Structure formats: structure tokens, C-alpha cells
């Protein structure tokens, strides 16, 4: 499989650069009969794009998705679904200077070494623009998971720089521009962000994604374990530098007696496993957490080099987002949904005949 | 691809349960001309197996690997390499009790829900035994990477429970049973482990893996980014619950000006990226870190349920390893080597190095 | 991999139904630096579409392809290439009758059994319209093969119903509407077709595709042999019912001494192998031949059934093409080019030709 | 995917050369609960190996298969099934002369150009020995298909050189050494073979494979159509040079009114489609036919060249089989079974929820 296709049975193949004519993707393997419309995807796309908070009336990036195939009379046909988002916000800028530079902590240098050249306009394929299609594709998966299986996938910001959230109130998540589930932290986050914006610097973030209602049995050991595929999917998001499942790095200092999630007829007594045991879903909520690095597109000068190896000072002008990590929330939800969709189809196929009478444990 | 095959061009497919007749694997895509013998793999296998420390003369699990194909006159032919390890240490035990139980924090429950049954002897396919083949396959990759490309992949224990290592001295790593690179911490670790063993409890660990000498340009955006594939490979190891690249979760609280690795003609000024930028290797050392959960095979009783849903008290008898995480070091090295090998071939071709002087025949 | 993606390193993923909004595809894995424009693809598309012969000035299906990504400043960047063809010739017809019918020898019945429903407008995804994208993608492969490797892929009609061609003159192939390489047979074919058109019946055809200049060594035994992948690619074209390589079915009655292509320092003495030996290219021209079945879209009534199982008489109205097989010529060329491209990259790497002089940075 | 793995959900990965230590394979994706033992596979293997006819008491190649994993208490567990056949009939011969030669119509030349070297003992990986594992893996698929779905896959010789069979009596197929279904042709075939053996020459053959009881709906358009995957699987068998489905190459001269399989409430009126329509199974018997080339291992001298390009005369000594094509019958059955198994699992997964009330047509 090429690097731009994800999944085995439910596959998502994307194309598009930040300044190309359009972004698009092909979703293959969506079962027939699912009601689907542009609205299903537009909702999630709107959450992702910049300007939703401080500039709610302005739409700088239209991000309007169009369905080109695979849907007939409002339902999926089982044939591939083609999606497209035309790039409208393409300002013609003078990029000639950037063309010859490698900005520190950007993919310029590595893309150049891989391809021998690069589309330097705004980051090209390495730009976060391509994630728009992942969100669109993820919306299809989320709809199927929710409607057919009652699986709910939701994410939230659990940490912005030094500020950690203490409470998890799902209702709060969409009430503020941070996907923050803790109302008490919002103003602190706003102040922090304003300060950063003034400084011209940026900060990282931590996002949690939770999938509830996942039936036990999903995952294909030993290499396509559910947690391994989730790690792959989440680490493939721009700016992600770490992935944890359940207790994650806290496991290091946990005793075995602490860590193990004991089982009673009423349910599991804890969820340090994060919903995945032996690489297979246990029926418990699947809990993943990712670390996003701070953006490197800063107006504060940084040391870079040009294509001939000479030192240059690099400054990024234009719109400045002090914490791009926040915007990863819908993308992380989308990737988790896509992985679960793929695994559901793989399992349902390979073990559809298996009848298990052993009770499924809930959680106390 | 099925769940038991890893990789795109350099693929590893494994089989085998802890108490089956044998473990085995097929390595496909190894370029021709690489000198290879059982010794190359045995070395890494010996490092992995239990008893290397306190019982260096005893070999409870022989773990002797045999090459069945793909090597001729001491060199790989380019055809698939079949490897086998016959299971010799199969004690006939009375497993009937375990058969009907789901041990907490083991894969019993999830395997049962997936397959409707399971080979309950010692964990079956979910047991860590299968990792022996990964180490064997990884040895092939490591040899190629080192001989052909000068790439060195090495791992070490960076944290055992609460004990963190301060120094990194590669020479120390194989001088103690912990893969500990800091001589000053070894006795502390030994004492800690002895205490745990007496308690009957277990603890987690953190392993770091480093690949040096990796050329820039490896990785296939956007889904098969090098870091995404590494995360996949490492998370697929039993007991891994978290993966970080470079600064990892420390990124959350890093400012952009701190995080970015500035570039000068003499080189990069730091390596928070961990050697991967935009999903592609930058030429810097690739640094990954994983969290291993504490083993759940304890003699301290835990609450489980049986196949009918009744509560049972579960005790694991037999050999007790208080920190299985340590043993993941060679496995993590193996997985990183396999990923790099696969990506190298994707970038440069499986036979790109083959030089054939035999004339090409035209047609009369 | 899903059913709508072809290839391992050079992959083509398509979407689109005959009456959907658009057809499209994503080409992933095209190496960077190849000059590419819409014209390169339009040329091959124009050869494929109906109306090129008797109605050369009319364009009923515009089939105008647009490049949406992956090309910058006239050259491929190595990132995915998105292509789109908007469907313009969508007559709003009354399909309600057809919706409930299964036409004999059409995919209606099988699509219904697979998906539980189908887009019945004009054949939906099973229509030959989707092959337009294959031709567009194939044009990219053909350009690379020709420019970089000097490989030429060309096809021609070798038999139309009972009329076999005797001579192979490449110059003739594009001088007539049949892709016929034998000028002496053209008027016979025209007369035959006119008679069929009057009858309202149809006939099959045989197409040969030849690739010259292919270096030896392409093909991945044992399952992805070059000939096996070619057979897959060609059999996947609508209406193909048979594939032969080299002497093909003539081998059955050939003696071993006849069949074998002897070798001398000057070259091979024959090419019964068709350029593939042991599943790997030999350097000889690769010769494949396919059988196309006659179209089933006839105005002559045929027996079908409706969705409830009742007998119906089926008549197809509208444009009638007595030999759709002819139109498979550019599609067969495209598929062969795509297979060769994929195998070349597997053998030699996706970026093996990229030369980067920019210095590699070390670490301070 | 590498070249030595076949399939998407039910995958078969093989290794082994004719003179290596062993042949083996890993079957991944077999659902749990299928009763399986070595006998199931040994039966099909015994049919394949040489010496079954004239030397029924001699076993020159033992071909004893052993199950190493994936089966517990007589049933598959859903985990990978490892199979092994130790190579016992390895005569130590003097191959030094052959090492430097390229025998005409053998894979020597192409393997050399691909890998830069080759295991020249008896053909190495290009030898037909590797097909033994395909037969073993195919036996697993056939058992599942038959037991779970009532699908029967059977093959027979339909033509040996110039001798065509007229009748199809399944009972006859295993009563003679030719897999010939027409008792009246057996002595003619024996005489023909004896003559060939005296001449020292060889001849080709045609094998037909039929799958009955296949439910409609299997196949994944557009690239993984069932017929395309079958063509791939069958063309991957050594010596196959052509594949047809249904009417195959006869389609060329068939009128549309002749070719189409009309449908009535009682069933299809014909089966020119060969059981596949639009790339999806129709419920009709799937009928494929393959052409096998004559073996090139002859004692009659042929012109070859050596590694330096000098002309040499090549003679093959040792056991001589005038028609290797015959032996392809169990291999063709195995490949068809593997393809159907894979597609069943892919379909059952992606469309397991689809309920179709439209009646399934049988055949008149």
C-alpha cells in the first residue's frame, strides 16, 4: 500500500496540497445503505477550520466538501465515495524567498531530501491542510459506528501547555474554542493564549480521544492490534509526537496489583488498559491520549539554512496560531473512527459466524 | 494484509503459540547478497530469553533458530527466508482450571470474545513467546542496515519503576541483566527487583531505542510516515502502552522557540524532533521511547470471572518475572530495525543495489 | 487493500459512476520530477471515447481531465496526483423501469446481490465509464516508462469477430477507428460492423498489447509474478474473459522443443514466453492478448427477471456499439503501463533516481 | 505486500526452494472452529506429487506436511497456521556446471538478472516444488468452503496436447493418472505420453477448474473483481500461459445474442459468463480454464548461454516428465479455493448486514 492510503477494508486515500487546486479523498469499503450527505461531513469540518472562535462570521477557508460518487438517493451504494474540497483561499504570495530556505522544524528539509524538490507554497503536502479530508472521511466512519453499532467517538483538550483540565464535562467541549471539557479553565487558557500571541511564540497540547460502546473482539493480533493501529493513525497526524493508551506512561511506575483491571460479574473495576487487552477491544471505553508539539511557524526568528547550506534567518509571517494542537481534536476523533470502522469490518468478516455466549462486562 | 504480517516491501509474517509445536516466521523482501547465518539471529535471541541473568548456565527455553530457506552458500538469495524455533520447554501441566477462567489484565477475555475459544495453555498466541520470531527477523534487518548503510539500532532501559537512569553509556548496556546504561543504578535496580519478587508484585518500565546513521528521506507521508510506522511497530509489542518520538509528551509544555531544532551549516542544534520531521527521517538520530506495563501474571490473587460469568480468584503460579518490560529491549530494537528496513526498501527499491554484469539479450 | 485500489508502490485508486457527479482517481507513488500536464492524459482519453470515428466533431462525453494536485511548476512532486473528470453528458432519463429489472449478462443481478441495491442509472459503477480514469492514470505511467526507461507500450486490435489481422503495422493502428494494424482488413471490418449495427447484434474482439524495451528483472515471484499481475490487471477490464501471455493457449499443443525460446549471444531465437520467464521479465517484448465478450446492451429483446423473480423482456435503447471490445485498446495499454510502473518501482525504488546535492546535516 | 503473500483477509505466505531444508507456509485469517488435521492436507498433497501413477508404492518425495500452530484440540483457533514439509529427497549432485549456465525457457536467466545470483540447485525458488505449499494451504480453504458453505472446487484435465476430452465424468477424474474425466481418452493419452517419453520431448496441457455452490455476491469491483483475482492466482502457477473464464476466447466470435446468459425464474439458460458477471459471482458454477506450457527440462539439447554470454548446449538429465501440466490440477483447485475463501471473508465482512430477498437463480 502506498503512503497515502490508510486502512485495510475501510480505506481512505487522500490527495491535495495547501495551495493546489483542491483537496480530495476516496473512501472505499463503506458498506451500502448508510444515509450520507454533505452535511454529515461539513459539521465536523466546520469544527476544525480556523476562525471558528474569534472570527465566527468570517470564513477564510471555505472548506466546503462535495460528494462526487458512492451515494445514490441519499444512501451509500457500497462503491467508492469520492470527496472534494476546492481550495479557495489561495492568496498569491511571493514565495520565492521561502523556496530556497529550509525552515527549522518544518518538513522543508526532509521533503527536499526525499523528493529532490518540493511545493514550497505554504508547506505543500506537509501542511496541515490535508487533514481536512481525514475529518471528512472520519465523519463517514463516525456516522456508521454510531448508527449501526451505537459507538460514540469523542475527543477533548486535556492539557494546553501547563494548564491541565480537572473535570470532564462533554457538554462543555463545544462551548469554547479550545474543546476544553472544564469550564473553570477556559479563561485561564484564553489569557495564556493571548500572552503567547503577543510574544509571538507557541505551545504544545494534549488531546484525549474516547470511544464508548465498542464491542469486545476488535483488533487483529499480532501486528494489527487495535492499539497498534490506533497508535499508527494518531501518530500520523501532523505535530503528534506521542501516543498513549489507557494508563500510558503512568504504567511505568504502577505495580501489577495496581495496574490490572480486575473483573467482577458487575463489570471491570478500573480501566488502566484503556479498553484494549492483548491488542483486542475489551468492551471498555477505548481511551487514547496524544501529545502535540508547538507550531514552528513563528515570527520570532529562527536559524535555518538554504539549499546550498548557507545559514539564513527564518521568519514566518501571516496568520499565527499559538497552539495548533487544539485543532487536532476533530482529526484525532476522525482517525479513531476510521480505525474502528476498519477493524469492525475486518472482524465482522473473519469471525461473523462466531457465537459467544459469555457475558460482556460493563464498567462499574 | 492480515494481522500477522508486518511491512510493505520487507515483510515479516509470524506464527506460533507458547505451547504449540514451534514458532516460525517468513521474512520476505530481504535483498540478495547479504551474508546471513543462524548465529546472526541467535545472538539477539539469547539476549532476550529468560535466565540469562541469574541462571546463565541453565537454558530453560532453548530458542534455537533454524534457517529453512532463502540463504544459499551463506548469502541471502532474495527469496523468502523461513525461520523456525521448535518449542522444547513445554511442560505438560494441568490447565483445565485456567481454561475456564479469564485472568484479569490478560488477553483471555478478549481472545475469547474474538475467536469464541482460545488456546489457553500459557497464553497461546497472546503470550510473549511470539516475540522471539520478531527478534530473529529483526536481526536480519539490523545486519542489513549496519552492513549496507552503516545504520546502528540500539536500545536500553531508561527507567525501571521509579528508578531513572541518568547516564547513557552504551558499553554498560550489556554488562548487567537490565540493559541499564548507567552503572550507578544497577544495584538499586537489583535490590528493587528482589523486593518485588518477595512481594510477589510487578512493575513497569521505559525502554528507549535509538537509530543512528539513518539517511534523510525515509518515510512515506502522509499515512505511512516513519514515526507513524514506528509507533505501530512498537505499540504492537506485548505490554506496550505508550510510544514517544523525540521530546514526546514533553512537547506539551515546550514553547515553539524551545522545541524547534535550529539548523546551522555545522548541523542541527538539538533533536527534539527525534530524527523525524514531517514524517520523514532528517538524518538525525531517531529516538523513540516506550512504556511497558507491569505483568499481570502474579501469585497475588486477583479478581477474575469464569466463562459463565461467575467470580473467581485468580492466581498465577510458576516462574515469576517482576519486570517483563526489561525483556522488551531486544524486541524494540528488532521492530525499529524492521521498520527502517522496510522504509529503506520503499524509498530505494529492493534490488536497487544489485549490479548485474551479465549481458542483456536482445531479440534476433 | 480495497477493491478500488490497484498496485503496491504505484497505486491507482478510482471512484465514480456513469451518472454520478464526476469520475476521479488518485495516483500515489509517482516519483517526483516527471513533466506532466493535462494534455498527456487528454490525448489517451480522446482515443478512448465514443464518437471519435463517425462523429469526430461531436463530443458527447467531454471527458476533460483536470489535475488537482501532485504537480507543481509542470512537474510531479512525488505527492499524490488527484485527477477529476466531471460528468457532463448526463441525460435525465426515466430509469424507473430499469431499476426493477435485471438485464441478462449485465452486472445488475450480481451488484444487487452484493450490495442489496444499486445505482441503476446506466450501469452505475459497473459501467465502462470508470475505465476513463484508468486511461488517465495509465497515461502518467506510460510517460514515465517512455521518458525515463525507454519503454514503449502499444496495443492493437488483432481480431474483430471472425476477421483476423495478418500484418502488424504500427503506423496503421491510429489511421482507422478500429485500432487495426492491417490496412487491408479495415473495409471488411467496416462492412461487418455496419451489418451488425443493422441487425442490432454485437460481437467480441481480441486485443494485443505489447511492451518493448522492458529491462529484465521485473516481477516479484511467486505470487506477484509479472504475468500474474498483468493477468489481474487485464482481466479487471470490463468485458475481458480471457488473458494470454506469449504463445498462450497455443502452448497446449506445442512440443517442448518448439516452445522453448533458445538463447544465443546475439539474442533469443523466438518469444513464445511473451517476454516473461519464471514470472520475471526477460528483456524480450512482453506480449499479452485479451478476449473481449460482445456487449449485452442490445435492442434485440432478451430474457431477464425483475427484482421479485418474475420474467421480463429486456430491451436496451440508446446508443448502440456493436463491438465495445475495440475501445478496450487504450485501456489495455493503460493497465499494462500501470503494472510495469508498479513493478519497476518495486524493483528499483520510488526515489531511486532522485539525486539530491543538498548537504546532509550532522548533529552538533 | 510482498510477492510471496497472496490474499487480503485469508492470506497465504510461502517459503522454500527445491533443495533447501524445507518448504513452509503460514496461513493467516482462517476463521476459528474449523476441524483441521494433517490428513486434510496430505490427501491433496499425495495427489500432486510425482510417482503416484507408475510407481504408486515408491515415495520419492515424501511431502509429509506438519501443522505447527493455529490448531488446538483438532480445531483452528483463528491464529496463524504454520505448515512445514521437510525436504527429504535432496540428492547431492554436481550442479557446478549448471550454476554457470542459463537453460533456455527456464527462469535461470531472469532470476539472475533480478537477484544477481541464484540458487541453481534444481531451479531453487523457481522450481515447481513451492507449489506443494499452495496445495496444502488450498486444502484448508477447500475444507472451509465445503463444510461451511457447501462450495465444491474440482478440476480436471480437458486437453493433453492434441487430445481433447469429450465427456465430463467426475468419477473418472481420480481413476487415472491424468485427472482425465473421459475414460475413453485414457489409453490414447498413455500411448501419447509413452511416445513422448521415448522422444525425450514434452507437451502442454489444458486444465479446467470448476467451483459449484458459490453464493452470488463475491468479488470486489473494480480491481479485485473475482475473475481478476482468479486470473492472478492461476497465472501465478508455474507454466501457466493463459487463463479463461467461461466462454473465454470463444467470446471473440460470439454474437451478443449468443453469448448472453438469459435469465428465467427457473434459472440461467446458459453459462458463457462462467459464473462471474461484472466481476462478481452470480451463483452459477465458476468455470476457469488454463493453458500450461510444455516443460523445458529436456534431455534433447537446446541452445543456452553462460553467465559470460558464451553459447552453450544445454541438456537436462534426471527424471523426465513429458507433461508437467497434468500436475497443475490440484494446484489450480487450491488457488481457486484460496481466492474464493479470501473473497468470502472480504464480502461477509463488508456486507454481512445486507439482506437480499431477491431469489437466487439456479441453473437449468
UniProtKB/Swiss-Prot annotation, chains A, B, C, D:
Catalyzed reaction equations: 5-O-(1-carboxyvinyl)-3-phosphoshikimate = chorismate + phosphate
One Pfam family this sequence matches: Chorismate_synt
One GO BP annotation of this record: amino acid biosynthetic process
Pathway(s) per entry: Metabolic intermediate biosynthesis; chorismate biosynthesis; chorismate from D-erythrose 4-phosphate and phosphoenolpyruvate: step 7/7
Co-factor remark: Reduced FMN (FMNH(2)).
Cofactor: FMNH2
Tagged with keyword ATP-binding: no
Keywords of this entry: Amino-acid biosynthesis, Aromatic amino acid biosynthesis, FAD, Flavoprotein, FMN, Lyase, NADP
Signal peptide span: none
Disulfide bonds, paired cysteine numbers: none
Molecular function terms, GO-annotated: chorismate synthase activity; FMN binding
GO cellular component, as recorded: cytosol
Binding site for FMN: 125-127, 238-239, 278, 293-297, 319
Protein EC: 4.2.3.5
Lineage top rank: taxon: Bacteria
Protein residues bound to NADP(+): 48, 54
Stated family: Belongs to the chorismate synthase family.
Oligomer status and interactors: Homotetramer.
Protein function: This reaction introduces a second double bond into the aromatic ring system.
Name of the protein in question: Chorismate synthase
Source organism of this protein record: Marinobacter nauticus (strain ATCC 700491 / DSM 11845 / VT8) (Marinobacter aquaeolei)
Gene giving rise to this polypeptide: aroC
